[in-house]
Amino acid sequence: MELVITGSNNKVSVSDAVFGREFSEDLVHQVVVAYRNAGRAGTKAQKTRSEVAGTTKKSKKQKGGGARHGALTAPIFVGGGVTFAAKPRSFEQKVNRKMYRAAICAIFSELNRQGRLMIVDAFDLEATKTKGLIEKLKGLEVGKRPLIVTEEASEHLYLSARNLPYVQVRDVQGLDPVALVGADTVVITADAVKKVEEWLA
């Protein structure tokens, strides 16, 4: 298939397997959830009744009409331990390479179908100026949350976008499913398209 390069009459030939794939919501959801879970610290920790600080001496006598209690570290008391205490753990989920790449292809294909994929000849700035980047994005009409994808990282582009909270800049190597799904429009250079095809082929 061929896609039009924005701002010119030129077209770029792309693979149907990457940009014309059928969308699978289940697959994309699974990969996005796995990617987000892999970023979790997993450091949550609580103390059980055996770990909380406090005496284990019986708090009151056995007889006398009240409820029977032992140590004040029991979960029933304020300041006591937690019954099913959370412990540090990994939230990582295994995702096969084939599944991951298929999900990326499905996302690119859906972006293309929805008209949210914009291909440009080049996307670079002569100087590190946030104002210059804003003007360039306004000219392209990319929406509030654009994702700019280049073949290789550009320092001018990265530093110019750093002060814009909803603008993301990635090179092909740094692409991930969460960034692609969350973008209103993906602006990608023609060279980056070729590199994406090499990666996902």
UniProtKB/Swiss-Prot annotation:
Function statement: One of the primary rRNA binding proteins, this protein initially binds near the 5'-end of the 23S rRNA. It is important during the early stages of 50S assembly. It makes multiple contacts with different domains of the 23S rRNA in the assembled 50S subunit and ribosome. Forms part of the polypeptide exit tunnel.
Q: Which species is this UniProt entry from?
A: Xanthomonas euvesicatoria pv. vesicatoria (strain 85-10)
Q: Which family does it belong to?
A: Belongs to the universal ribosomal protein uL4 family.
GO cellular component terms attached to this protein's record: ribonucleoprotein complex; ribosome
The region called Disordered is annotated at 44-68
- Keywords, alphabetical: Ribonucleoprotein, Ribosomal protein, RNA-binding, rRNA-binding
Q: How does it assemble?
A: Part of the 50S ribosomal subunit.
**Sample GO molecular function, one term:** structural constituent of ribosome
Question: Which Gene Ontology biological process is one annotated for this entry?
Answer: translation
- This chain belongs to which protein, by name? Large ribosomal subunit protein uL4
Q: Which InterPro entries match?
A: Ribosomal_uL4, Ribosomal_uL4-like, Ribosomal_uL4_dom_sf
Pfam families documented for this protein: Ribosomal_L4
What gene does this protein come from?
A: rplD
